[in-house]
Amino acid sequence: MDKRQFLKASGAVVTDTLLSRYISAEQQAATPRTNWAGNYTFHTDHLHQPKTVEEVQQVVKSCAKLRALGARHSFNGIADSTENQISLKQINQVELDAKSRTVTVGAGVTYGQLAPYINSRGFAVHNLASLPHVSVVGACATATHGSGSKNGNLSTEVSAIEFVTADGNIRHLSRAKDGDQFLGAVVNLGALGIVTRITLDVQPTFQVAQSVYENLSMSQLEHHLDEIFLSGYSVSLFTDWQNHRITQVWIKRRLGPGVSTTFPPEFFGAKLATKKLHPLAGHSAENCTEQQGIPGPWYERLPHFRMNFTPSSGAELQTEYFVPRDHAYQAILAVEQLRDHITPHLFITELRTIAADNLWMSMAYQRPSMAIHFTWKPEWPEVKQVLPMIEEKLAPFSARPHWAKLSTIPPATIQHLYPKMPAYQALLKQYDPQGKFRNDFIDTNIYGS
């Protein structure tokens, strides 16, 4: 979720030479590298940019410490390193197997690149994030998600992964053959190895129609929360926490036989919007996906923002907490008590639901969940004061923070929230006994106290 202006992508791809893997610190020091939002500056100037999996193996062997960079859409230090980072942007092959209904993608591929490709060949993935510009591998490694009470997060689409281990060897794990190890390896937080390829399940392409309603009383969620979130294939509620109301309800309806593209004029007292809207009042909706019940392919409706626009910047901060769905309304009321602390620093909050899964480090591990997502103004000193207040309110609900977003929850608490944490720690020790892929984020949140 974001408020920034979007610029149309040129589609140009700049290819680096082989030697760019070894760009010197002197060459990069003049331009400090940051994440996409600009709120985090990476602590190394050593960025390796291999073109092939074989070159990835060489980089891994040559480095004592290494972290994968991804698409830089994380808001914390999960991808950071004080020594070496590796960008797999040029590992961008896509292989569709129509017979097995799978697609294998290189670690540099984004959902915005993948979706049109498989759609043109008659296929789809079941879910997408609100922004299409994140990398497939990075999103799956952090359990990033779209929405839908019956839809698992993006990681649940994974059926196999290929990664380079600390000794430089290639390892494959699959859902079909590797059982628990696979369940522990999908949401790997970048600590298992350098993931080079990932295989996703696909399904026949489908159409979606989207409409928006305005001004839903928050009281309607007390007795109708499940009904509201099940009213579409994917449903998002937006609020600024003022006036006990949901400012907008975005309903994405999966089309099929007998499914209408006509939305009723009222929805639990909320009014059907008469024009296309941006989640933030007063902002142009030009960059949002089509609304008002206009049918379109899945990849042009499931994200909130259009794929052929790419964000020029992201001057914002993000936090997100996952609570059990059966306590969702109580969690909403608990956060609402802090509205006057939250709203001055907030762009918007989005509420969305996700199905339970069995991936060890997923925020939805073994519990149907609701995510409470905050898009903040870039005011970190103030936001940093508000987060512990929110986290205290959500503590009774065992809220799990998004791995790639901002949080102040203590490491010991985070570890307690994941029943399979000891098994995950053992898995990391098996594949990376010397901690080559560990960084401060992993040391703190997975091993800290």
Outline where the language-model segments fall.
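Noncatalytic alpha-helical scaffold of FAD-dependent oxidoreductases
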Residues: 2-449
